[in-house]
Amino acid sequence: IAVAEMYQLDFEEFLLAMGCAQSTIDSARHCFNNNQSINESLHNYFLQQFKIYLLVGGLPEAVNKFIESRNMTLVRQVQSDIHNLYKIDASQYDNERRLVIRKIYEMIPSNMENKKKRIVVKRIENMAGHKQFSDYAEEFEYLTNSGIALAVHAISNPRFPLVESESKNLIKLYLNDVGLLTDILYGLNINAILRDENSINLGSVYESVVAQELHAHGNKLHYYDNKQRGEVDFLVDDYSSLSVLPIEVKSGKDYTVHSALDRFLSTPDYTVSRAIVLSNYREVRTVDGITYMPIYYSMFINGNNGISAADTIIPEVPMPTI
């Protein structure tokens, strides 16, 4: 058995599969592009569909099963089968390396619940001081190249383009599909997602789905990690301004509290003047360079936002007269 790279449906594709009209999505895209809020009824529709997406995810077999039955027991069975497939794959490696790959894969959900979500090498085989990140490079590459996991590289001193200053040894790993994550975390308790249970912190779930959306739209994934200033969930290249766009993800009511992001924006050396905070709240507004947007607007974030098709046409160079 071999795992081919799985391309799951992103949230926009999921909406279309659920019967949402393309014109409705395009209307929301127009609002996103113009920093506008959508109306209350459409907001409620998108938010409810988004919560369902957190449960079902975008793997085609799981989506098809949900459309057929609306039965999360059947969907969870599909997701469990995929978990098991991931665990028994990596057949090209010897048994020891297969076990390491499986261990790293199984660590991802618990890592995401930690305050510092990055991979800590000594926890992989409980061999403190004996192994370095480079010792597991092949295992990490397998998980990311096969599409089983998404790697988000740390940046401590952001510069455009981000790839020039990324850390090769400090990474966070996310599961490739948010439905797989909620299957592990909540099983059949769908109300943990659908009813906003106060006792449940959905931070890791929201981060996971945003990582998935950013990746699906061609963004290279990075996050900000600085000992003095703190951590910001995501950084992406903003090609329209040749700058860096920080993105913070909030699942709770305190979405306007983001001290690390504030410190990030107040650092003159970074020359970054705008940021996005994603949350459950409908209203789009900009305060001190930070634009607050509803979480489902993540389906529109692309580093090429602001660059039109006309901007990519290079005119012919006229031949000079001699």
Where on the chain are the PLM-derived regions?
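Interdomain motor-coupling "hinge/lid" segment immediately C-terminal to the ATP-binding subdomain
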Residues: I1-E113
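Nucleic-acid nuclease catalytic cores
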Residues: N226, Y270-I290
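Conserved nucleotide-binding/hydrolysis micro-motifs of P-loop NTPases
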Residues: Q8-E13, S156, L180-L181, D254, ...
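Short glycine-/polar-rich loops that comprise or flank the Walker A/P-loop
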Residues: I1-A2, N219, T271-R274
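Active-site ExK catalytic segment of metal-dependent nucleases
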Residues: V244-K253
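Domain-level recognition of nuclease-like catalytic cores that cleave nucleotide substrates
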Residues: Y281-I322
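Accessory nucleic acid-recognition modules appended to NTPase machines
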Residues: V63-Y239
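Active-site-adjacent loop/helix micro-motif of nuclease/hydrolase catalytic cores
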Residues: K253-R263
